[in-house]
UniProtKB/Swiss-Prot annotation:
Motif residue range(s): Twin CX3C motif: 44-68
Membrane topology (UniProt): Peripheral membrane protein
Record's protein name: Mitochondrial import inner membrane translocase subunit TIM8
Cystines in this chain: C44-C68, C48-C64
Organism: Eremothecium gossypii (strain ATCC 10895 / CBS 109.51 / FGSC 9923 / NRRL Y-1056) (Yeast)
Domain notes: The twin CX3C motif contains 4 conserved Cys residues that form 2 disulfide bonds in the mitochondrial intermembrane space. However, during the transit of TIM8 from cytoplasm into mitochondrion, the Cys residues probably coordinate zinc, thereby preventing folding and allowing its transfer across mitochondrial outer membrane.
Keyword Protein transport: yes
Gene Ontology biological process terms in this record: protein insertion into mitochondrial inner membrane
Quaternary structure note: Heterohexamer; composed of 3 copies of TIM8 and 3 copies of TIM13, named soluble 70 kDa complex. Associates with the TIM22 complex, whose core is composed of TIM22 and TIM54. Interacts with the transmembrane regions of multi-pass transmembrane proteins in transit.
Length: 87
């Protein structure tokens, strides 16, 4: 993959700069979502799955995972709302 030098970036016209910045912001947002998914997957799996007995989840494991993910999402929503109210 080739990179773009800072000099080449400075030579771009304003619409191109805005397009690149928009692309970078979108990619950054995607990365944050992916990191959150990995984080709660890891956390919830460790909390809810203690041994693998079969290819299917037990009813208890299934409910535990649902509750765990919901708690994780609710917590993140509260944090975001709290941060937004501070700004």
């Amino acid at each position: 993959m080739s990179g773009i030098s800072p000099t080449e970036l400075q030579n771009l016209d304003e619409p191109s700069k805005k397009e690149i910045m928009g692309f970078l912001e979108t990619e950054n947002s995607k990365q944050k979502v992916q990191m959150s998914i990995h984080q709660f997957t890891n956390l919830c799996f460790k909390n809810c799955i203690h041994s693998v007995q079969s290819a299917d989840l037990s009813a208890q494991e299934n409910q535990c995972l649902k509750d765990c993910v919901n708690r994780f999402l609710d917590t993140n929503i509260r944090i975001v709302k709290g941060l937004q109210s501070i700004q």
